[in-house]
Amino acid sequence: MFNALVVDKDEESGKTQAAVKQLSLTDLPVGEVTVAVEYSTVNYKDGLCIGPGGGLVRKYPHVPGIDFAGTVENSSDERYKPGDKVVLTGWRVGEAHWGGYSQKANVRADWLVPLPEGLDTRQAMAVGTAGFTAMLAVMALEDHGLTPGHGPVLVTGAAGGVGSVATAILAHLGYEVAAVTGRPETADYLTSLGATQIVARDEINETVKRPLESEIWAGCVDAVGGAMLARVLGQMKYGASVAAVGLAGGAGLPATVIPFLLRGVNLLGIDSVMQPYANRLRAWERIARDLPMDKLEAMIRPATLSDLPGLGADILKGQVQGRVVVDVNA
């Protein structure tokens, strides 16, 4: 028997309830690799899946957790053997498939990557989907020509998971980072990660008044979307790129095409769920190299399985700073 966070749904009321329960290996879905999970984390999607589902969870009972890291116990795939350390992010695990809020997991071998050299399983989950997405965003900006000499890079939702890691990576790479936050109390935290400028959310979270404003930003990692993204597009330098990674501020985009047509601005969509294996390895190698471990440690908030219902609600309200690392065995 082992512990897992199980979400059940009352069919009559439609309400969901999450609680730590004991399961057996026979309860797990079929998979090629059985992993003894050591750590997981909390992302925005996890908050949706712990709570009402947000349209992501179709079948109950369900075990959420879109990320996990641990040790292989059994494998029918020759790529992995017992004792191997592995990481999983994406592939709709924790949404359509049972996830990492459990001491055991059965998954497809194709969904795993080896634990990157230089990271332990706890650090890998401090990174998690949020940090993996942040690295993909930085890589996309670099692939579109961004270098530190081009000017300041804006990070929206900077105190959240994606924003925190993006800020730390960009600062380490020598960029001038402007961090947007709606919580003034996070300014010292963001400065400690390497931000050189703190931008109040209210300054930039307005509906577009003019399609083009002064050219300010050489690049942007946007975790907010909505009106803020629309406003930022009009402030980008000529030929600059915005990597869109989230929708904390809404899925709409009340913008015009003028920044694309007159300034050649690029809007880059970043998906972390279905990334090919080679890209995953490249991103994790970059994370191990370009994310300072002392900065990562400063982001970590420890948690246990029993903390998850509350944390799921908090992250949906934008009240979680940095990265939550869940010790599923504590």
UniProtKB/Swiss-Prot annotation:
It is found in: Cytoplasm. NADP(+) binds at residues 44, 159-162, 181-183, 201, 247, 272. Disruption phenotype: 25-fold increased sensitivity to acrylate, growth is strongly inhibited by 20 mM dimethylsulfoniopropionate (DMSP). Its main location: cytoplasm. InterPro entries: Acrylyl-CoA_reductase_AcuI, ADH-like_C, ADH-like_N, GroES-like_sf, NAD(P)-bd_dom_sf, PKS_ER, Zn-ADH-like_protein. Induction: By dimethylsulfoniopropionate (DMSP) and acrylate. One of its GO terms (cellular component) is cytoplasm. SMART domains: PKS_ER. Keywords: Cytoplasm, NADP, Oxidoreductase. Its EC number is 1.3.1.84. It catalyses: propanoyl-CoA + NADP(+) = acryloyl-CoA + NADPH + H(+). It is an enzyme of class 1 (oxidoreductase). One of its GO terms (molecular function) is acryloyl-CoA reductase (NADPH) activity. The keyword Transit peptide does not apply. Gene3D superfamilies: Medium-chain alcohol dehydrogenases, catalytic domain, NAD(P)-binding Rossmann-like Domain. The zinc-binding residues of the alcohol dehydrogenase family are not conserved. Probably catalyzes the NADPH-dependent reduction of acrylyl-CoA to propanoyl-CoA. Restores acrylate resistance when expressed in an E.coli strain K12 acuI deletion. Belongs to the zinc-containing alcohol dehydrogenase family. Acrylyl-CoA reductase subfamily. Homodimer. This is Acrylyl-CoA reductase AcuI. It comes from Ruegeria pomeroyi (strain ATCC 700808 / DSM 15171 / DSS-3) (Silicibacter pomeroyi). The lineage of its organism: Bacteria, Pseudomonadati, Pseudomonadota, Alphaproteobacteria, Rhodobacterales.
